[in-house]
């Protein structure tokens, strides 16, 4: 496989561990359990439910689907949860899962990116599974940031003092 295959793996890992996860940590730090579990209505998700959903998705698609671990996901439970688990506990759970998935992705031989896999009820390649998780994580990270902003106001994820946005979150280095 070409260098682009390795670059895809490297960039996927970087986005999950060095971009999305630290932003979720920064955005949710200091929120109360009530903030974390607040819902606009019963059809909407709370920050807590979104974090559980990301945890379940990453575990099912990467750790199980690509890494071979048992699939123990209870997807509906991610949305039904109402126990008001503290934000720090939720983040620790999500962070542990993302770092476990990072080890799985890091171990992938780039020449296997086009190999077939079946995850949930979908037939796809290894590359498509990684791409799907990264895209899905990005979408829900944005939702978490929006909900956190409702409670905290400016999340201060960027230093704007130089005229060019510079990430302030741990690991943030990419330009936006």
Where in this protein do the model-derived segments appear?
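Short Lys/Arg-rich basic patches
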Residues: 8-12
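Acidic/histidine-rich alpha-helical segments that form the ligand environment
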Residues: 82-118, 125-139
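Extreme N-terminus of proteins, especially the signal/transit-peptide cleavage junction
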Residues: 1-7
């Amino acid at each position: 496989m070409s260098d682009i295959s390795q670059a895809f793996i490297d960039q996927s890992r970087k986005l999950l561990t060095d971009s999305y996860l630290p932003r979720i940590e920064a955005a949710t730090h200091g929120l109360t359990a009530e903030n974390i579990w607040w819902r606009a209505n019963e059809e909407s998700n709370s920050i807590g439910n979104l974090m559980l959903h990301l945890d379940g998705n990453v575990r099912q698609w990467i750790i199980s689907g690509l890494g071979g671990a048992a699939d123990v996901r209870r997807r509906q439970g991610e949305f039904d949860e109402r126990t008001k688990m503290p934000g720090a506990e939720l983040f620790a759970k999500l962070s542990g899962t993302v770092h476990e998935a990072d080890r799985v992705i890091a171990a992938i031989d780039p020449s296997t990116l086009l190999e077939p896999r079946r995850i949930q009820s979908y037939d796809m390649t290894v590359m498509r599974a990684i791409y799907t998780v990264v895209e899905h994580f990005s979408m829900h990270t944005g939702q978490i940031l929006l909900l956190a902003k409702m409670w905290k106001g400016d999340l201060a994820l960027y230093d704007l003092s130089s005229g060019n946005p510079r990430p302030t979150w741990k690991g943030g280095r990419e330009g936006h």
